[in-house]
From Swiss-Prot:
The keyword Signal does not apply. Gene3D superfamilies: 6.10.190.10, Aconitase, domain 3, Aconitase, domain 4. The keyword Metal-binding applies. It is found in: Cytoplasm. GO terms for cellular component: mitochondrion. This is Aconitate hydratase, cytoplasmic. Substrate binds at residues 258, 263, 421, 502-503. Belongs to the aconitase/IPM isomerase family. It is an enzyme of class 4 (lyase). It comes from Solanum tuberosum.
Length: 616
């Protein structure tokens, strides 16, 4: 919950952006209490005085309205975190995680450190002798070049930033100033603009600024999840070849929420989150290897250097265009017909049967196997005996590593499944769009192209070693080989396993692959709960221990000594894990509540709920 004197100066659009980032700062939700700013937004979006008055009266009557003109009752929280808004400065996040914040003024020095650092969340290990490499190529007959840090994707995208008038119109003002000075984005930078709603399009047009965004290549591509989730589409073949053949660490700059490895695009190893105005600025610069305070962005039509300060709009300029361009009637006209649908929606054939009719030919919706063979009696706790290690991970394996939501790689098991059913590559769509098909999502589990699995001894990609045979296989194929032989599997991991988006498929997928337990140094809170919900046992190494300190390679077989009776299992109890090499160690079983034990006893939360419903 956010509180304090700075609240009154924070717009509702800014609050929405911060609240939407809750998973990134480890919260289930971010709550801003209703105050006068909320009421002003209701008026701005076309709500009647009667509705606004009722909202205020109701919340005041329930002591849920914050009035900064009245004496504030001191609130008591379990813990406190103070932020002085005067300390806030322009920044980006990247290149591989949203919580790796980089102040704008430090971007160039940070980039050079990244090239030097060993491979990791803040390193690419590019040898000194090739850090200045220039990859020259022909872009549709035009001479072009890429270097480490060259921006090849610049996208104004996300579900909240793109509904924030100040940053959207701010980006348009940057484009306007750049166009007037004679600056233009290089044609090989893939630019796009996905407004947060139809209202955004209306006020960009009303302001007269959309034409400047168009001039810089930021044309409106549609509404919905685009580059942020990996739906940027292919890069031009010449650009893709230049990156691949010269091993260029190319960059994407986007106004999205998340930049986990492999999410934005397979060919952009460096992915930075930035505000929409900064996205335009970096697109114009064409590189993240730049100090905006000292280095020119480009050369204007008068032959003089143009700097960041020359194209950056003032707060007053932005406020003026917001005031004149964002009007209540825009919200009314856009949303008054929202429940009427459009012609295509209204012409859809809708079955009238009480039960859903599964289409066996559909590659989007498939009947999941969760309830097949289910009986009314709970199966009880499942033990883990002589399980093989499917994957051996280090720290910070995110839900994007576990269950990517972006594009389906042409050589992946999911692609193979689709092609076998006559789906053309251009129609693969994304994992996110096909989350209603368990066959595809199971094949997409651990399909992240940046996956680092210690069983592969340094090789990066969505593969593993099938321990009994020594074969190197896709994770899905190896998992199916274990399942067909009746062999259970476990996963070894480091700290922060399951961080990132709270994605249910990151727990469903491993369950479908036959994973029975995950042994990690620590878990992201929501993901640990999701694992329990799918019947997977989360175990934590004891403090100071992990797979490496215990000498575990992942080549062993693991037996987890769980009691067979659920009444003998307690939240947080110690359990012994034994290996076939003679090693044994103690872990903490991370069932944290009694209800989680009930889920485990039933085989998962889905089975638990079904049994509860049928008993009513």
């Amino acid at each position: 919950e956010f509180y304090g004197g700075g609240m009154s100066g924070l717009s509702l659009a800014d609050r929405a952006t911060i609240a939407n980032m809750a998973p990134e700062y480890g919260a289930t939700m971010g709550f801003f209490p209703v105050d006068h700013v909320t009421l002003e937004y209701l008026k701005l979006t076309g709500r009647s005085d009667e509705i606004v008055g009722m909202v205020e009266a109701y919340l005041r009557a329930n002591n849920m309205f914050v009035d900064y003109n009245e004496p504030q009752q001191e609130k008591v929280y379990s813990s406190y975190l103070n932020l002085d808004l005067a300390d806030v400065e322009p920044c980006l996040s990247g290149p591989k995680r949203p919580h790796d914040r980089v102040p704008l003024k430090e971007m160039k020095s940070d980039w050079h450190a990244l090239l030097d650092n060993k491979v990791g969340f803040k390193g690419f290990a590019v040898p000194k002798e090739v850090q200045d490499k220039v990859a020259k190529f022909s872009f549709h007959g035009q001479p072009a070049e890429l270097k480490h840090g060259s921006v090849v994707i610049a996208a104004i995208t996300s579900c909240t930033n793109t509904s924030n008038p100040s940053v959207m119109l701010g980006a348009a003002l940057v484009a306007k100033k750049a166009s007037e000075l004679g600056l233009h984005v290089k044609p090989w930078v893939k630019t796009s603009l996905a407004p947060g709603s139809g209202v955004v399009t209306k006020y960009l047009l009303k302001s007269g600024l959309q034409k400047y965004l168009n001039q810089q290549g930021f044309n409106i591509v549609g509404y919905g999840c685009t580059t942020c989730i990996g739906n940027s589409g292919d890069l031009d073949e010449s650009v893709a070849s230049a990156i691949s053949e010269n091993d260029i660490v190319a960059a994407a700059v986007l106004s999205g929420n998340r930049n986990f490895e492999g999410r934005v695009h397979a060919l952009t190893r460096a992915n930075y989150l930035a505000s929409p105005p900064l996205v335009v600025a970096y697109a114009l610069a064409g590189t993240v290897d730049i100090d905006f305070e000292k280095d020119p962005i480009g050369v204007g039509k008068d032959g003089k250097d143009v700097y960041f300060r020359d194209i950056w709009p003032s707060t007053e300029e932005i406020a003026e265009v917001v005031q004149s361009s964002v009007l209540p009637d825009m919200f009314k006209s856009t949303y008054e017909a929202i429940t009427k649908g459009n012609t295509m929606w209204n012409e859809l054939s809708v079955p009238t049967t009480k039960l859903y009719q599964w289409d066996p030919k559909s590659t989007y919706i498939h009947e999941p196997p969760y309830f097949k063979g289910m009986t009314m009696d709970p199966p009880g706790p499942h033990g883990v005996k002589d399980a093989y290690c499917l994957l051996n991970f280090g720290d910070s394996i995110t839900t994007d590593h576990i269950s990517p939501a972006g594009s389906i790689h042409k050589d992946s098991p999911a692609a193979r499944y689709l092609m076998e059913r006559g789906v053309d590559r251009r129609d693969f769509n994304s994992y996110g769009s096909r989350r209603g098909n368990d066959e595809i999502m199971a094949r997409g589990t651990f399909a992240n192209i940046r996956l680092v699995n210690k069983l592969l001894n340094g090789e990066v990609g969505p593969k593993t070693v099938h321990v009994p045979s020594g074969e190197k296989l896709s994770v899905f194929d190896a998992a199916m080989k274990y399942k067909s032989a009746g062999q259970s599997t476990i996963i070894l991991a480091g700290a922060e396993y399951g961080s990132g988006s709270s994605r249910d498929w990151a727990a469903k997928g491993p369950m479908l692959l036959g994973v029975k337990a995950v042994i990690a140094k620590s878990f992201e809170r929501i993901h640990r709960s999701n694992l329990v919900g799918m019947g997977i046992v989360p175990l934590c190494f004891k403090a100071g221990e992990d797979a490496d300190t215990l000498g575990l390679t992942g080549q062993e077989r693991y037996t987890i000594d769980l009691p067979e009776n659920i009444s003998e299992i307690r939240p947080g109890q110690d359990v012994t894990v034994q290996t076939d090499t003679g090693k044994s160690f103690t872990c903490i079983v991370r069932f944290d509540t009694e209800v989680e034990l009930a889920y485990f006893n039933h085989g998962g939360i889905l089975q638990y709920v079904i049994r509860q419903l049928t008993q009513r």
